[in-house]
């Protein structure tokens, strides 16, 4: 898949549906909160791919303002699920609500993976 040069919505949707996994990972990025960037006092990128265990806050949509830990990341549907974000089905069963990562801000990174943190050491702010 080459870089996008078309304006046609049909081709934009097709490119997203057929995107390879390394591009999907990039599409699963969310901005870091300004408070977290100031608190860390080290150079971090503005946006990083969301992972399970990150603490995020929803900033757009029906669940705006809600915070929680990322429960799962689905690269196939390009959605994440957050602990505590559920909706009721017709049979009253509670189901996790999928959210697009562009609608959240990362409040705190999951710091259990030292390789992930080392990768950001030389990143621009």
Model regions and ranges:
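Intrinsically disordered, Lys/Arg-rich N-terminal extensions and targeting peptides
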Residues: 1-51, 123-125
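Residue-level "contact hotspot" at macromolecular interaction interfaces
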Residues: 46-49, 61-64, 98
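Structured, basic alpha/beta domains of bacterial-type, RNA-associated proteins
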Residues: 67-123
């Amino acid at each position: 898949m080459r870089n996008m040069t078309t304006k046609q919505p049909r081709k934009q949707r097709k490119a997203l549906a057929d995107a390879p996994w390394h591009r999907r990972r990039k599409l699963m990025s969310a901005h870091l909160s300004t408070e977290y960037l100031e608190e860390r006092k080290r150079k971090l990128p503005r946006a990083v791919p969301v992972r399970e265990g990150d603490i995020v806050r929803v900033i757009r949509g029906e669940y705006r303002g809600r915070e929680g830990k990322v429960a799962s990341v689905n690269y196939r549907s390009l959605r994440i699920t957050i602990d505590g974000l559920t909706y009721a089905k017709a049979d009253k069963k509670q189901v996790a609500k999928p959210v697009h990562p562009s609608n959240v801000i990362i409040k705190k990174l999951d710091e259990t993976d030292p390789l992930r943190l080392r990768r950001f050491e030389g990143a621009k702010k």
